[in-house]
């Protein structure tokens, strides 16, 4: 299996990386637009021109339709789509979840994906809906694991995506991830989350993703199946997801819905397009409303992809800038349930400590959610472990940062500072990270801050 995943930068649990499979490269985080080979809303060549280096298509649909199957077997899936970039294929698991059955076995669909040259192919896992009885989830999970083992032992298979299932049971998600981590895979998707995303159950999404992520190997990307909305992507990247796929750009367009990082807007309610992408600058909402349905769908789908690309690019830059947590916070505030997911991530920030860089640039803090940032949790824990109770020191309260100005008046090892965000900080660490670069909301009266600082000096 010719697969390599290189991590170039990181923030929170998010990673800026590069996945290389069979000579094709994909920069991560990445979104793979879903291409329906039977009736593509946008031609894959157009998708490539919009800046996407990879797509995902359905091998089950290709195999089921004779004309698609024959062309794919003759020209490969890249030739069928007319797309020379990274192509991942799904196995029919979505159809299995929707209709309860598919007309293909796991071995047949895995071998077929190899024959058509998929860069990454998916096993026929069994998605279990949220809140299903535990006995059913355990049964479906065992089937998924059996099929994963079967796939990796075949003499003919593509680089594989082994999907983590387990419904809304965190322990079963962890168990599935542990078992799959023992098998060679190119990608480890987290499946069965589409119903949660559709119902805006962001708290449950955070729980199942963290449960899966905790047991997956760090040298392979994690794909959050079915996550393709701007509102969800920064939060998912902060949890450690690297790949996403979206049919929503086309589904929303067909029902006259317009994607925004702040949510989904209805075309009929738009006075102007709050976007400067080519699709939006060439038209106004009145023009688009008067178009024939097919052309209107194309324009909206094009905008939706531009919006998704913008979110992906913004998220990549946030990783490099060390601002991924701030981005996730700001985006999630657009919807109460997305914000509930952010609160849950902050509550469980300790689970992200092992992935988050211990040192970065400035740290912005705003409220109780900010206290859950993994780098601040790590700092507080290290203070407790290395300095204990700091007995015998004068603990100064109510002093504005930077504390180093106070330290100049007394020996630093005589002092400690009670800090709302960091705990009790030894004086000698006043100029260390993150104490010296923590940015918090300022008081209404800056003069009062200065007065308290002067009082601290006198004390």
Swiss-Prot record:
This enzyme's EC code(s): 2.4.2.48
Biological processes, Gene Ontology terms: tRNA wobble guanine modification
Classification via InterPro entries: ArchSynthase1/Queuine_TRR (IPR050076), TGT-like_sf (IPR036511), TgtA (IPR004804), tRNA_ribo_trans-like (IPR002616)
Active site per the UniProt annotation: 90
Keyword Secreted on entry: no
Binding site residues for substrate: 125, 192
Binding site for Zn(2+): 275, 277, 280
NCBIfam families for this protein: arcsn_tRNA_tgt, tgt_general
Family, similarity comment: Belongs to the archaeosine tRNA-ribosyltransferase family.
Function: Exchanges the guanine residue with 7-cyano-7-deazaguanine (preQ0) at position 15 in the dihydrouridine loop (D-loop) of archaeal tRNAs.
Protein name per UniProt: tRNA-guanine(15) transglycosylase
Record organism: Methanopyrus kandleri (strain AV19 / DSM 6324 / JCM 9639 / NBRC 100938)
Protein's gene: tgtA
